[in-house]
A protein has these predicted regions:
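N-terminal signal-anchor transmembrane alpha helix
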Residues: 2-32
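Physicochemical signature of membrane-embedded alpha-helices that form the seven-helix bundle of GPCRs
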Residues: 10, 48-51, 81-84, 109-116
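Membrane-embedded alpha-helical transmembrane segments of multi-pass integral membrane proteins
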Residues: 14-17, 21, 84-92, 116-123
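Cytosolic, membrane-interface loops and tails of multi-pass inner-membrane proteins
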Residues: 23-48
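Short alpha-helical packing/oligomerization segments
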Residues: 66-87
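Interfacial loop-to-transmembrane junctions
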Residues: 91-118
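Juxtamembrane boundary at the C-terminal end of a transmembrane helix
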Residues: 122-134
Length: 134
């Protein structure tokens, strides 16, 4: 399998999700005629936070996935982390954007994201550590 294939597919899917979240923000900005901030509109604020939160957590997760994949971790292990990241980000976005917001979905999405971030960090430390020890 070519290097970073799993990470590339995951990044492509996440890129499309980010595009959708961005279009959601733009739509609310146009609807409410707000160019900066949320203008006190709850729906715009939620859309902005869904997009912002995505932008905060996805890059480090993709970097950790790429590190794991470049260090010859099994493709299925890298893919499992990618799936967990995608599921977590979708749940969070749905939970925060639903009117009224679905707090349980939002929290579940963050749990997926945090667990995945910790798992990716631990996997990188363990996998690379074992490879270095021979």
């Amino acid at each position: 399998m070519p290097p970073l294939s799993v990470t590339a597919i995951t990044a492509a899917i996440l890129g499309l999700i980010f595009f959708r979240l961005s279009m959601n923000v733009i739509g609310y900005r146009r609807q409410h005629k707000v160019s900066l901030g949320s203008g006190g509109h709850d729906d715009l604020e939620r859309a902005m936070r869904a997009q912002g939160n995505f932008a905060e957590y996805v890059p480090i997760s993709l970097i950790l996935m790429a590190c794991l994949e470049l260090n010859a971790a099994p493709w299925w292990l890298v893919a499992a982390t990618g799936i967990a990241l995608i599921v977590g980000r979708l749940l969070h976005a749905k939970g925060i954007n639903e009117p009224p917001p679905n707090f349980a979905l939002r929290v579940l999405g963050m749990k997926f994201t945090f667990f995945n971030l910790i798992a990716l960090s631990a996997l990188n430390l363990g996998w690379v550590g074992l490879r270095l020890l021979g």
